[in-house]
Amino acid sequence: MANLFNWLPLLSGRQADGIKAKVEIYTWQTCPFCIRAKLLLWWKGVKFIEYKIDGDDQARQAMAARAEGRRTVPQIFVNDQGIGGCDQLYGLDSRGQLDPLLATPPNPA
C-alpha cells in the first residue's frame, strides 16, 4: 500500500536531497502526534517506512521491545536507532540535529 504522503512532495516540489538515512515510524492512523511527526518528515522530503499498529497488540509489543520498553506512538527510528516520539523529533529539528542525522547513511548489514 502506498504511503499516504507520497504524493505531497510532488505537489510541493520537495525533494529528498541529501537524505540517506533509513527512517521508520510506528503509528496509529488517528494519532495526532503521529500525524504531526509524519508531516515534519514529509516537509523535509523524507521517505519513511510506516508500521501502522492500530489494535495489533503483537506489533505494539514488538515496537516496545525495539523502543526500549516505550509503548507510546509514534516511535521513530533513524538507521535502526530509536530517537523517541514526536516531541523528540521536533526537538532534534529545533536544535539543528535532525538534518545531519537524516544525511547519515545506514550501516551496511
From Swiss-Prot:
Membrane-spanning parts: none
GO BP, sorted A to Z: cell redox homeostasis; cellular response to oxidative stress
Protein's UniProt keywords contain Transcription: no
GO molecular function: glutathione disulfide oxidoreductase activity
Every Glutaredoxin domain range: 11-109
InterPro entries hit by this protein: GLR_AS (IPR011767), Glutaredoxin (IPR002109), Glutaredoxin_subgr (IPR014025), GRX_bact (IPR011900), Thioredoxin-like_sf (IPR036249)
Cysteines joined through disulfide linkages: C31-C34
Transport recorded as keyword: yes
Keywords, ordered alphabetically: Disulfide bond, Electron transport, Redox-active center, Transport
GO CC terms of this entry: cytoplasm
SUPFAM superfamilies from the UniProt entry: Thioredoxin-like (SSF52833)
Stated family: Belongs to the glutaredoxin family.
Annotated function: Has a glutathione-disulfide oxidoreductase activity in the presence of NADPH and glutathione reductase. Reduces low molecular weight disulfides and proteins.
Name this protein carries in UniProt: Probable glutaredoxin slr1562
Source organism (scientific name): Synechocystis sp. (strain ATCC 27184 / PCC 6803 / Kazusa)
